[in-house]
């Protein structure tokens, strides 16, 4: 064995030299490790599984090549015995929950005490256990903190229970495993699973056997975003025995390396034999053996771990809380030392810190959490958003701060339903309304529009070519209804269309196609490849004529057909309509011509060199792909979701950059970008595809810099190239474009691009998708929106918001997002204002009290001020509306204006602080001046009453629309205060409250306190009104 290993290492060295690899030691280590692993596997399993031959050496080479290309690949093979469960690889349970029974409390408490103001109040509360620092009652400080934590813990528990229920639904889906029913979560590696048609594949499997035919199709749009169905080949013709050697789990959905051994005969298996988890079987039932489960599946490895999202507003409030705390600390030290240095000065500092703790209000957390709940419930109860589900109530205000929307294409912007829309033959064009003319040509009866025989022949030839040049297989269901299976929905749409014209595909085998009762022999078939952008077939008709048919992208096909004056122009017309265009051509072959081609092609296919595919393509090009007869063009429409065009226009007008990230081909994405109006009419489209050098990338970016209004279409590999070499320049230029389309984009690339925008642009990003391949970016985004898809609910379950269709996004952002951000910001400002106001009064009282840290308000007054006396009016702000729904959608620019001005900005914060300081000084100083310092009962009655009424009037001055809830909260609070006064005899002098002096003093103080605020507001509306204020007029 060692001699064979040395021989293979020698070959590896030659291969390394050929590949110009920079680190030749890696593949030898990989080979040694894999050889040892395989040898141990052979001994432990009692099978002579590994005699390292050429195929295995190439497999190991490919493994390193994949690793060198950036695929994280461990070459330790896992051995799977068909039908023998392997519990050591773990179960197949899906989990999106954040907590379990043991981690809930510590994790939640950690999340809460990450907020500075919560930690601050915890320390303040604990300080009351130290006798020298005790001020008033312990419950005055500890009760609000406990209340805040209980509200938050309850909300988190409810949200996580909902996630657990959703996971339970997916985990308990029943499958037939080893001929017995089994829940999806209990499936293990080694199990043989039967998958029925249209059933979701629960784990990564190797296809063993098909029940009908010898091939299967899967839909992968929920995994990689590609709309084309994928052909899969069984590696056996039975499902009861065999051994699979598979490489370690990797992220790449396009690579797989392994072998399948049956009766001591070993054969290589590749990605063509795989059934990845979360894809859907599109053909008849199959049997597969499970290789990877749970977190080891491609789907899970391409998904980001769920994290607790924190809104930007929360971070801003946390920052300003630290500023206020610093101010409190400086103020406390200043007041302590302003009256001389005492031996116990530190106790005075701490007592001042506790007295002024209201500056950082503990109930800010409660108010914000309750506001989030209210906004979330309003969203869910919106009759214009049927089926919307708020899965995370932590970030409703983030909906109002979105700068970038990154959206998937398949199932999000489109319905993934293809429809034949246009046909172009020579100078004749046929739309959907005039297809009866085409049908008349096919069925040889008189056409509604007179056509010459030559024209009719051209139409027949084109339709016949479309009926034959495809990979579609008909399948009859149990109900007798015929369905079509293919690797491309375009082909299915075209075949369905030709069947309506009378050319019905009734049967297909590997060797023949049957149209009605006519059998056409398949001599050769050349499958579609993204690199070649075309698909061809050679058939022999019932009358022995041999014809080569070819269809593909216009950019490629124009090189193969005879010169045409109309081809380029008509292709451009169809593309501008957003249709997926195919050029169709044919070439008649004599028996001698076909024989010569067949011999040359066969010789090329037997080549063992790495250039075998290239040689075969050269033969096809030399013998077939030249001087072909142009038959015509087809235009297929990928139907858009409802109101997609309107929604995208609204988002753009709101100043939001819209990007489309898709796993689909460049041509397909380009068509959808045009048809959805993501690209405006006449807008310049710049395409970057298959970049190979830094100079080329730099030139592309230079072009884009000079054309900021253009749309960029770029493939995933080119994007990775730009990020790797020119990251800052790439992000700076691309982020300013009006629209960007990224094609051939993997789930990991989607998530990475989201992170880049967040980090480099410090912008809020909203990601929208409907498939499992979108989960990663949805979890990374500031706000993730999942659309309930036809193929599953993975994106919907992982998202913060779940909606039924893409058109709901505009309402979610422009209406609910704007309200949430604006009103929550205003609420936070008022809570801070309320805390500062009472703290300023306390500062004035301490100064007048010879700088002693004595409490002005204690007990019920201190607790009641921020709860039953002011909480309802202040909280009612969340129900205010500055403009109507109609105006928001008529003027989406309001969204952009609000986001750019920032509701919770330095300017607004400083304004809030100055107003609070001014009003606090006026209330406390004028109370002392007009009432006196000695009569504490009278002084407290006036001062506290002015604080309450000042807050009620301040709220009233800020209200734009007097909703019933707001009016009731003001009146109810006023009544509660009046009715509670008789119970405040320990603090107030009740006889004074009944006298005239109390009323005129209070009225005078309130007038002086509120007059500047009212005047400032009136002047601003007059001289520099905001856009919404103008609309209110």
Curated annotation (Swiss-Prot):
Residues that span the membrane, as ranges: 133-153, 274-294, 317-337, 344-364, 768-788, 843-863, 913-933, 939-959, 965-985, 992-1012
Source superkingdom: Eukaryota
One Pfam family recorded for the sequence: PhoLip_ATPase_N
PROSITE patterns found in the cross-reference section: ATPASE_E1_E2
Site note Involved in the release of the transported lipid into the cytosolic leaflet, residues: 362
EC category: translocase
Binding site for Mg(2+): 408, 410, 770, 774
EC id: 7.6.2.1
Keyword Methyltransferase attached: no
One GO location term (cellular component): Golgi membrane
Topology of this chain in the membrane: Multi-pass membrane protein
Keywords (A to Z) from UniProt: ATP-binding, Endosome, Golgi apparatus, Lipid transport, Magnesium, Membrane, Metal-binding, Nucleotide-binding, Phosphoprotein, Translocase, Transmembrane, Transmembrane helix, Transport
Entry's localization field: Endosome membrane; Golgi apparatus membrane
Cross-referenced InterPro entries: ATPase_P-typ_cyto_dom_N (IPR023299), ATPase_P-typ_P_site (IPR018303), ATPase_P-typ_TM_dom_sf (IPR023298), ATPase_P-typ_transduc_dom_A_sf (IPR008250), HAD-like_sf (IPR036412), HAD_sf (IPR023214), P-type_ATPase_IV (IPR006539), P-type_ATPase_N (IPR032631)
Active-site residues, Swiss-Prot/TrEMBL: 408
Assembly notes: Functions without a CDC50/LEM3 family accessory subunit.
Function: Flippase that catalyzes the hydrolysis of ATP coupled to the transport of lysophosphatidylserine, phosphatidylethanolamine, and phosphatidylserine from the lumenal to the cytosolic leaflet of the Golgi apparatus membrane and ensures the maintenance of asymmetric distribution of phospholipids.
Protein name as catalogued: Phospholipid-transporting ATPase neo1
Native species: Schizosaccharomyces pombe (strain 972 / ATCC 24843)
């Amino acid at each position: 064995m060692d001699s064979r290993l040395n021989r293979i290492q020698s070959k590896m060295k030659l291969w390394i030299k050929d590949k110009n690899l920079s680190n030749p030691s890696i593949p030898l280590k990989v080979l040694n490790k894999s050889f040892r692993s395989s040898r141990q596997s052979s001994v432990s399993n009692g099978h002579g599984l590994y005699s390292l031959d050429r195929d295995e050496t190439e497999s190991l080479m490919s493994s390193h090549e994949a690793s060198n290309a950036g695929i994280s690949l461990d070459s330790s093979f896992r051995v799977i015995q068909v039908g023998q469960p392997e519990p050591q690889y773990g179960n197949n349970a899906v989990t999106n929950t954040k907590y379990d029974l043991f981690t809930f409390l510590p994790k939640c408490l950690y999340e809460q005490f990450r907020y500075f103001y919560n930690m601050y109040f915890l320390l303040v509360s604990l300080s009351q256990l130290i006798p020298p620092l005790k001020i008033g009652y312990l419950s005055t400080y500890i009760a609000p903190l406990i209340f805040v934590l209980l509200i938050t813990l309850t909300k988190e528990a409810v949200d996580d229970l909902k996630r657990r229920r959703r996971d339970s639904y997916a985990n308990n889906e029943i499958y037939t495993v080893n001929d017995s029913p089994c829940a999806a979560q209990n499936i293990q590696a080694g199990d043989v699973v039967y998958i029925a048609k249209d059933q979701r594949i629960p784990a990564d499997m190797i296809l063993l056997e098909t029940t009908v035919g010898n091939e299967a199709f899967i839909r992968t749009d929920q995994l990689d975003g590609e709309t084309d169905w994928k052909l899969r080949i069984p590696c056996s013709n039975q499902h009861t025995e065999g051994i699979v050697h598979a490489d370690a789990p990797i992220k790449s959905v396009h690579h797989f390396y392994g072998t399948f051994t049956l009766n001591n005969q070993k054969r290589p298996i590749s990605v063509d034999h795989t059934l990845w988890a979360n894809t859907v079987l599109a053909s008849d039932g199959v049997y597969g053996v499970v290789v990877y489960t749970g977190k080891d599946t491609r789907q899970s490895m391409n998904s980001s771990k769920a994290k607790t999202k924190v809104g930007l507003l929360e971070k801003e409030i946390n920052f300003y809380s630290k500023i206020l705390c610093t101010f409190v600390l400086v103020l406390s030290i200043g007041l302590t030392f302003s009256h001389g240095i005492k031996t116990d000065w530190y106790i005075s500092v701490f007592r001042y810190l506790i007295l002024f703790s209201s500056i950082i209000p503990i109930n800010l957390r409660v108010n914000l959490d309750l506001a989030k709940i209210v906004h979330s419930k309003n969203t869910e109860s919106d009759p214009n958003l049927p089926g919307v589900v708020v899965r995370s109530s932590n970030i409703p205000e983030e909906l109002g701060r979105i700068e970038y929307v990154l959206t998937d294409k398949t199932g999000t912007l489109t319905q993934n339903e293809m429809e034949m829309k246009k046909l172009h033959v020579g100078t004749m064009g046929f739309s959907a309304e005039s297809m009866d003319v085409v049908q008349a040509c096919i069925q040889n009866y008189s056409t509604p529009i007179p056509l010459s025989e030559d024209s009719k022949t051209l139409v027949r030839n084109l339709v016949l070519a479309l009926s034959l040049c495809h990979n579609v297989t008909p399948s009859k269901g149990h109900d007798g209804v015929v369905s079509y299976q293919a690797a491309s929905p375009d082909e299915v749409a075209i075949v369905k269309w030709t069947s309506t014209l009378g050319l019905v595909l009734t049967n297909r085998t590997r060797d023949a196609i049957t149209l009605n009762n006519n059998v056409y022999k398949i001599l050769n078939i050349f499958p579609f490849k993204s690199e070649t952008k075309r698909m061809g077939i050679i058939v022999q008709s019932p009358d022995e004529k041999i014809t080569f048919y070819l269809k593909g992208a216009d950019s490629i096909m124009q090189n193969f057909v005879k010169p045409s004056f109309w081809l380029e122009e008509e292709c451009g017309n169809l593309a501008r309509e957003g249709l997926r265009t195919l050029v169709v051509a044919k070439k008649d072959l004599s028996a001698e011509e076909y024989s010569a081609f067949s011999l040359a092609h066969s010789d090329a296919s037997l080549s063992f060199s790495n250039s075998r595919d290239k040689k075969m393509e050269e033969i096809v090009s030399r013998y077939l792909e030249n001087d072909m007869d142009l038959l015509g063009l087809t235009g297929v429409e990928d139907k858009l979701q409802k109101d997609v065009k309107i929604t995208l226009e609204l988002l753009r007008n709101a100043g939001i950059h819209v990007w489309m990230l898709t796993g689909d081909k460049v041509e397909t994405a380009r068509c959808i970008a045009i048809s959805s109006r993501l690209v405006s009419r006449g807008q310049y489209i710049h395409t970057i595809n298959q970049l190979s050098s830094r100079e080329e990338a730099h030139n592309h970016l230079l072009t884009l810099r000079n054309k900021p209004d253009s749309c960029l279409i770029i493939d995933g590999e080119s994007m990775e190239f730009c990020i790797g070499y020119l990251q800052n320049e790439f992000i700076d230029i691309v982020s300013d474009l009006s629209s960007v389309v990224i094609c051939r984009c993997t789930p990991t690339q989607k998530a990475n691009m989201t992170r880049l925008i967040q980090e480099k642009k410090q912008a809020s990003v909203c990601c929208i998708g409907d498939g499992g391949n979108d989960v990663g970016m949805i979890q990374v985004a500031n706000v993730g929106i999942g659309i309930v898809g036809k193929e599953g609910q993975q994106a919907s379950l992982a998202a913060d918001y779940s909606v039924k269709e893409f058109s709901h996004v505009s309402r979610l952002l422009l209406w609910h997002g704007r309200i949430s951000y604006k009103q929550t910001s205003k609420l936070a400002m008022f809570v801070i204002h309320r805390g500062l106001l009472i703290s300023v009064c306390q500062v004035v009282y301490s100064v007048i009290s010879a700088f002693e840290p004595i409490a002005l308000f204690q007990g019920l007054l201190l607790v009641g001020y921020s709860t039953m006396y002011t909480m309802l009016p202040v909280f009612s702000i969340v129900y205010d509306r500055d403009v109507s729904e109609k105006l928001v959608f008529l003027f989406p620019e309001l969204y952009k204006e609000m986001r750019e001005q920032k509701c919770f900005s330095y300017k607004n914060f400083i304004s809030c602080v100055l107003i609070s300081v001014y009003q606090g000084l006026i209330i406390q100083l004028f109370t002392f001046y007009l009432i006196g310092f000695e009569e504490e009962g009278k002084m407290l009655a006036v001062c506290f009453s002015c604080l309450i009424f000042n807050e009620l009037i301040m709220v009233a001055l800020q209200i734009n629309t007097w909703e019933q809830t707001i009016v009731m909260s003001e009146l109810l609070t006023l009544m509660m205060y009046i009715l509670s006064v008789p119970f405040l005899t320990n603090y107030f002098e009740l006889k004074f409250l009944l006298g005239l002096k109390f009323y005129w003093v209070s009225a005078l103080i309130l007038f002086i306190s509120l007059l500047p605020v009212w005047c400032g507001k009136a002047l601003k509306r007059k001289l520099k009104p905001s856009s919404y204020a103008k609309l209110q007029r």
